Amino acid sequence: GVLPFTGIDEPVQGILLGSVIIVVTGAVDDLVSLRPWVKLVLQIAAAVVAIRHGVVIRILTNPGDASAEAIALGALSVPVTLLWIVGMTNALNLIDGLDGLATGLALIAAVGMGGALFFIGYPQATLVYFVFAGSCLAFLRYNFHPASVFLGDTGSMYLGFVLSTLPLFMKSSDSLFVSLGVPMLAMGVPIFDTALAILRRTLRAVLTREEHGADEGNTRVMQADTDHLHHRILRQLVSQRKMYTPTM
């Protein structure tokens, strides 16, 4: 094992080491603004570290049908897990456009996952999620509008990384729905917003490439915009405080 994490279970080591990469990446990005592709490569590196330590989606099950046979992902385990971790990390990062929004959504997701785990008989995992939720709630006191402390890329990427990796070292098949289903439901808004942003920017890049050339089009894919769901709701409601209810 790695010296600072000696004696800790291997999957937990992977999450901790991956978190270090995510936090350092976010801190550097907050200070000097990394290129989007550099940030993506480092996010993938963090996910690979977690995967190499056993944080992997190996099977898919149907929680509504106890008799249904579990589907082994086999060779697809690694790419599916990589997509899940990097996708969730970016989902929280992209949704962090207003005071308290990413923190509030992470809080809701953690409470939802902790509650689901409690009802299927995982008290220790429940405690982990409720501690995580408690830290989000304490931070939200200072992050809610008007915020005095901000997540930055460091905090938002870390929240997404932890929420995506924590459930994945539970081994039993009956917990898999909690591992993927509950996070996807609780994080539905940022996941949908991320998918929409990728589609929107890709379409704009194609149109830009036709008008101004390939280099300009490629830049547009990585370029931030103000067309996220929370920006659209804010333009309609004017007040940040009013917009939290429909978003969360």
What kind of region is each of these model predictions?
Residues 10-45, 50:
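Hydrophobic alpha-helical hairpins/lids featuring a short glycine-rich hinge
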Residues 29, 67, 90, 221-229:
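Juxtamembrane loop-helix boundary motifs flanking transmembrane segments in multi-pass membrane proteins
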Residues 1-10, 28-34, 51-67:
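Transmembrane alpha-helix boundary signature
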